[in-house]
From Swiss-Prot:
This is Structural maintenance of chromosomes protein 2. Belongs to the SMC family. SMC2 subfamily. The gene is smc2. Its main location: nucleus. The SMC hinge domain, which separates the large intramolecular coiled coil regions, allows the heterodimerization with smc4 forming a V-shaped heterodimer. Residues 520-639 form the SMC hinge domain. SMART domains: SMC_hinge.
Amino acid sequence: MYIEDIIIDGFKSYANRTVIEGFDPTFNAITGLNGSGKSNILDSICFVLGISNLSQVRVDSLQELVYKKGQAGITKASVTITFNNSDKKQSPAGYEHLDKITVTRQVAIGGRNKYLINGHNAQLSRVQDLFHSVQLNVNNPHFLIMQGRITKVLNMKPPEILAMIEEAAGTRMFEMKKNSALNTIEKKQKKVDEITKVLAEEITPTLDKLRGERTSYMKFTNNQTLIDRLQRFIIAYEYYTYEKKLESSEFESFKAEIDKGQKRKKDLTLKSTDLKAKISELAKQREKETNLEEMDQQEQKLSKELVKYQTSHKHQKESLDKEEGAINNLANTREEIKQSIQQKQKEKQSMEKKIQSIVEENQQINAELKTLQNKHNTMTTGISTGADGSSAAEDGSYTEQLMEAKKTAVNAASEYKQAEFRVKHLQSELIAKRKAITQEQTDHKKLQAEQELVEREIQQLTRSIQELQLDNSKQQELTEKKRQLEPLVSKLREEVGNASAQLSGLEFNYTDPSKSFDRSKVKGIVANLITLKDVETATALEICASGKLYNIVIEDDETGKALLSKGQLKRRVTLLPLNKVEGRSIDPQKIKNAQKIAPNGAVKPAIEFVEYDKELQPAMNFVFGSTFIATDKKYAQKAAFDSSIKVRTISLEGDEYNPAGSLTGGSRPPSGSILTQIQRLNENNRCLRENQSQLEHINFELVQLKSVTDRFKQLEQQLNIKQHAASLIAQRFQLNPHHQLLESIKEMEKSIESDTQLITNSMIKEKEALEKVKQLESQVNDFQSIRESQLKDLEKKIQITKEKCIKSNKIVKGEQVFIEKLDLEIQEMDNELENLSKETQGNQGTISKMRKDVDTLARSISETNKQIQDIRETLSEIRKDMAQKNDAIRSLHQELEKIQSEITEIDMSTEKLKSRMNRVDKDRQEASKWLEAAIKKHTWIKNEKQLFNRPGSDFDFNATDPSKANSEYIKLQEEQEKLSKTINRKVMSMFEKAEQEYQELMEKKKIIENDKSKIEHVIRELDEKKNESLRTTWKKVNKDFGSIFSTLLPGTSAKLEPPEGQNELFGLEVKVAFGDVWKETLSELSGGQKSLLALSLILSLLLFKPAPMYILDEIDAALDLSHTQNIGMMLKQHFTSSQFIVVSLKEGMFTNANVLFETKFIDGVSKVHRTVFNKKDKQVGKKK
């Protein structure tokens, strides 16, 4: 099958209907300038073949295939290809009867897309099947070779080259089928898994459950037979026992024992009366004695008073000692203050003398300043000039300056000499005072030690107070808390009392059945043992529990028996022993189903809404375990009546939905839910316990802190006293001779330092004055020339003198201020002396009063001691006498108790015997009635009565223990009762059906697994055949590959071989030889040589299974003319049965073609011209 002609209309650059006819069956070439439309011819062929990847035809949408996208008035693109089908061997499947096949594809603006085969509409799938059957798959186009594909082949890895061989061999289809088969296996495996899952999750559990039910059913039938046999045995034993009771003689023996006991009781009663009379007489004699209890109380009272007096006396004595010490300290302080006043007055007088000399010095400085200012004025004003040119006044002025300078030098010398004398005198006096201070050091050290001691005591007291400060603050805080808690506890106690009164029915009162009874085994009423997680569920939970809310939870059945028999219960109760009660719970699957129909926890088991101790789990399951609670009536109704759930459900409003079909609801008690009230009572009880415990703890801490508080106050008082003592010591320091000597030494050291500085300054002053004398003497004859400089010097001196004057004025004022300060200090000391005198007078009165109190307390202590001694002597005598009488009474009481105990035992024995007599009599009557009733009810007794208790018979009571038989009977009855509730009476038929389903599924599973095994076996066989076919293909392609490459590039050879260390099934790589030398890599090849190598490989693959048509699009673009010509020759030589359509721009390629089509672009439209090459290379042209 090959192309005969192509009709293009409105497709891409072919605006008008263009018929391209006369295609050669073997070799056709298309050439033309770039953009002339040569590649559009190839695009039109791909378009008809049904290409889906439009990027290969260089457009993004079908509308772009229309000429100028329909903007030039052409709205449809159509391509028709006529195929010659005369060679029936290459004919598509189903078209062997046709010699020509016409395929048309049209696309219009707006998206209409249409296919026609021989003028008839066809689906895309039909068109694709037509071309696929002759290896023309345009969406996987091996027949279409483009330059880009050649480039890809150069970069392929060994597995990718192997994949091309597989494609050529056709084993790719096998891989697809293999993958499909593997998918089938996977599906079958999923089916097996589903069957396994159904077996594991549904059938097997159901079968196991039915097996268990079948076992239970068979056990039920066997138990029933055994129960019937045991029942006859037990009835026979009871009949035998009752007969023996009728023949018993216990009644007479009991009566004889009673008479004997009554006689003994009469004798003991007479003896008891005599003992009571003796005890009464002794008690009267003891009561006549002095009242011992009153005397004991009086002794205790006096002892307390004595301790009180002794404590007060001690405290008063200590306070008196302190006050007397304080008076002595005040006297010492007054004396020290008087000495300080005298010292200050002396210091004032000394300062007044000192300031007088300073004032005189100040006046001298002022006079010097005035003289300098006058001299300055004289020099500034000037005097008339004499014949020699000098001024007499100025001469006189210089003379005055000269005299003044000499005077200054003399004064300065006098000053430093006087200062040297004073320094010498002060130094000698300083030595003397330092000796004196050493002598006074003892008293000073003593005073200093006293001050350090007081300061240490102050520090110690301060630390103690700081340590107790926290406790003092804590006491205030605790007192405030106590004030807040007391009314709160009182209020809570009242609320708990009122609530307890309203809920008095929820109390369980009983008497201990025995002395060793453990009350912890009685857990309490159910309502008191739970805590609600949500108060809103209270009504629903109360409806759920109903009467069980008031049941009593106990640890075991033995506790229950003890309570019922000996607990003296005042009302009828229901007990729930934890070891016996059967907890019921909802099936987990039903809970899951409920959660599906009511999302977000709208339906939950009632037990999830309460909190309780884990040990109470069985009882809580019994009360709440089998009911749902729903947040909404809608969900409650669904949970109750849904076929997959059917569980009793209660809404939050209290409406009950029963799966049996009943609905219960209505009004609620106005007092509210009992559970809510209990919850509130429990919460109040908890708060009361917490607050009461907190209050008790606070009271306890306050009691402990009371002593701490007293200690804190005492320490504060002591600290104040010590601080006052410290201030007095400080004042004594000021008046101490040692201290005064220290101050005097400091003043003398200052004076020495000042005079030393004065000596230095005076010597400098003298030196400056002498220099000035020399200078004035040299300047007298030349006054006019230096007048200006002298004026400046004079002004400078005036400035210095002014500063001295100001400084002197400040010193005078400072000294005057110091004298005023001394006056104030003297006045303050006088005031303090007056205050101390007043304080001393006040303390004298206090001491006098305290001495009287101490004496009074001492007398009280003496008198109280005497009273206590008298009372103790009297008490000793009375106690001795009473001890004797008490011993006698105690002895008589012991004897009386023995008699009373024996009488009680006789009474109890008599009561027991009477009870047993009554019981025996009653038993006889009951036995007679029971025997009569048993014979009527069980007719078999008459016939088998002679066998009762006969050895070897079914009623051998010695061989079979009746009590064990009875226990076994009760146990079987209980077991039978449980089984009757749970057994499935249809289990036998259900088990057979389930087992049949199980066998069927197992058979299906076996079949599927066999099918899977067969498919896997076939795949293994086909894998072997595929590998064989692949090897055959490889050899054929390898041969053609070398032949084609040798044709394209003479003198070379090429082959495909596996990578080193691997076989051909893992991959193939290309090897090239130039001459006889094989190259290790392809890197030595030029670009053109690599392109020829890749093209050779592609063509060798195509040659293995030739398609009817091949399209080559500019594959020679990278090749020179010689190689291009070789390609044309190779195509003619190797591809004789396929049609080639080659697009090329090189003459070496298309000169080998039989038909050449040239494209041109004229007036915006592509045109085609056909040229036929004959064997003599003559051209025949025809324009289309």
